[in-house]
Amino acid sequence: MTKRVFATIASEALSMNIGKGYVYRLDGHVMRGCLFDSAPNVKGKFFCKLFVCLLTGAVDGVKLDLSENVKIPKILGKRTDIWGAEGQSQHKKFASALRKRNVRQFFARNASLQGIIDHTEQIVWPQFGDNQNAWHAAVLADDPSCAIVYLSRMVERFRNAVPNEFVTEASLQSKIQTHEQFIEMLEQGDSSLLRDELINQSHGRMKLLGLVKES
């Protein structure tokens, strides 16, 4: 996995929730982001992105630079009430794995990317929200079959979703159409084009925010 691709996965982890106080050094790139800045649903999506970012890197053999310059996220702090008991337990284990510099161990029973996606979906984003980071990571890790499975699952979820004040019927139909287009691209072996597009989107966004410094 190249530095640029890994940085993109990392940028996906930080793109939702930007702030001060935490520094991650990932394969030559310096990124700053704060975990606890806004509403619980944003925190949830951020954590899911962080899981996929770190664990995809671990699965693909990219070592994380957890040097003395890196502040381990204080997952069990003043705001843990937003997670509930299950969330607190998972995040405590995750923090422990980070401190021990062994992220892979955290998901030892889910060594595959699909296992990681399943797990993050279950504990972080159980509703019908568009959990983009999961299939983004699959595409970026060059696992199109995994991305197809996840995108297909999302399409089915959107079809069964009931519109409400936050999600309209038109929005759901748009998501279905977009996801089906991505599936078609991947099935036709066009994953490289989609991967390049995701890289450009994420990397460009991080540059605009001043959160990426080239090594």
What does each of the following model-derived ranges do?
Residues 26-215:
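Intrinsically disordered, low-complexity regulatory regions enriched in serine/threonine/proline
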Residues 1-19:
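Amphipathic alpha-helical segments
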Residues 20-24:
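Long, charged, glycine-rich C-terminal linkers/tails
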